[in-house]
């Protein structure tokens, strides 16, 4: 079986270093908000060219805590994409605000700024662009809208650690950015984790309170908070992987280039597009085809794993029926949900594996 993501293979390359780090944590006797967490936060802030990084328990909490810390809640609207993982909208609902969806660009799969502007109302407080699959969103246009209408911008960068937009790292392009360290992410741990990056010191202070029960000092609280802390063990693992992220992302880009080289002539497949002023880090390599089911079945028969991202747009989810969206409201997003699928992509793919994947895709073209 050729796996969509091969975490076992990937972690074998850092296993000894991780075990050494875990042993250090065990010996320290300090397992929550210790020196490893502090070191990770400082290194990520420096890498992403921001002044603050606040680690939390997972990427979803990163979004929820950021929205709450920015004062977004009941009666407010936040614009985001309907073509993404559920947490992007769920976090908005969790703080009592209303998610408002805008359609996406058919080539990058990210928010279409022109459609975003049509959705802005007097209740709109923020925009959450998602850097989907590792492709940076149109941040200049989104930030321009935010400035024009006095809105906040929260980057959902959960799939995009290491992506670059016009020379600037994703995670430094809005009022705050949220990352996930779920195991399958480009920078992941052996469990859950997340981090929020910002250059707003007051926001970072509020986030640190929120992640630890609203604590100002031990046993004293000035607000209702959460229990959302990154464990020392996960921070230690992430420090090891942080040293590998440039190499891993570079390998992903190499595999992506190779897919594009050999599949570019296939009329039944539309390949992901990388904008010239951006660095896509291919968290997933998703191709588009009106023959999706046929191609996926051929790959399954050849023991090649695939995945559909995402089969149901968020505006059509049962839980959001009350928002009164209908099929056809976001035609680009809805067509992607019917045609897009992911093929294997990870740093330790091999040429022979990739050649086999490419051959199956090419052999099963046509009607």
Model-derived segments and their meaning:
Residues 8, 20, 37-43, 47-53, ...:
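PLP-dependent aminotransferase class I/II
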Residues 1-30, 35:
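N-terminal "arm"/small-domain region of PLP-dependent enzymes with the aminotransferase-like
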Residues 54, 79, 100, 153-154, ...:
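Structural detector of well-ordered beta-strand residues that form the stable sheet scaffold
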Residues 179-180, 194-199, 239:
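Short beta-strand-to-turn element immediately C-terminal to the catalytic PLP-Schiff-base lysine
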Residues 28-77, 91-95, 101-103, 168:
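Phosphate-binding glycine-rich loop
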Residues 155-190, 218-222:
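Conserved active-site segment immediately N-terminal to the catalytic lysine
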Residues 68-157, 164:
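PLP-dependent aminotransferase-like
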